Amino acid sequence: MVGNRHPTHDRRPTSGTTAALADSLTGTSDPAPPRVWVMMGHKAGDNSQILALAEALGWPFEIKRLVYRPTELMTNLLAPRTLLGIVRRRSSPLAPPWPDLIISAGRRNEPPCRWIQARAGKPVRLVHCGRPWAALECFDLVVTTPQYRLPQRDNVLHNLTPLQRVSAARLEEARALWQPKLAHLPRPHVAVMVGGDAGPYVLDAEAAALLGRAASAFAAKAGGSLLVTTSARTPAPAVAALAGALDGPHELFRWGPDAAADNPYFGYLAVADSFIVTCESMSMLAEACSTCKPVYMFDLDTGPQLRWPLLTSLIGEVPATSFARRLRRLRFQPLVYRTAMVTGPRRLTRDTRIIQGQLIAAGRAVWLGQDFPPGPPPVPLDDVARAVTRVKALTATADDHRIAAE
């Protein structure tokens, strides 16, 4: 529910003076946690990151949902601290009591967050996940990943993968729910996480059908089954082609806005023995890698470096790329991406090949059709813990300044 605090109780005293008096009388000191606002955006991957950080901090937090105007890009470029880019009557209220900490992601949220800082009349720490559009100096902390190629700065935390909400407790809960439901399928379970178009990557019917064939062959070779899930970005023609190509024991979850309660995503993460993930989704790759199980990336590129020939050992033939698919390289989104990579400012572009390469170098993933090199399994990711440590250091500094002022 919009504006609800998690958990619902709030241990915050009415004033710092009251809290200090109570502490002096009882001989204890239990400072209230900072007031945290989580600024939800329009991208599932961004929202997953900021919720992961908010939950891991262990403090109560308030979710703010914003509805953006079609003109938000223009107004936000003209006024870096403004609410002109949002529809205020349809958005969560942005009013006192102001937060001590804002966790946000995405270009559209930056002007409202900076507007809050200007209005609050007190220090408000701003933590941004991903790649900011404003200058890095505008943020107290930027939690970023390799594809954005941000410079080394004191207020920039470079992680290997995007923050994700996978935890041991969440996986155990999901396993208890979904393992009985999937017990009829032979093991090993191979989870297939399907994304969609992004940057230079195109998930058309041709690619989806090949993914279905290759994943089916992969599971059959191991004597196992597939646990397949699409996502909000998966085009309908790709879903149909994927479903038609699946062979052998499998479960297919077709994502839909009305199917959230039955979404088996965390269940698949919990019970799967290995993963096949479309390579454009950094969030799904991070979530799969967080399990420390084998992760195989399926290439969706439309360029000459496409890695489909690696699938020959699975499907028994060299996968052909149709002329129509090669033409899709010239579609608007892939063309804009490639043009921006050549002519655009470096800090406003991203190169997902960097994070893919680092996952391979760290022994956490390989391309589908390749074998994992010998060696021990990877150690658990510590990206969320690193971010929590940095944020708590920020707020501790803010508390010291507040106490000194009192």
Describe each PLM feature range.
Residues 292-295:
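Structural loop-to-beta junction motif characteristic of Rossmann-like glycosyltransferase folds
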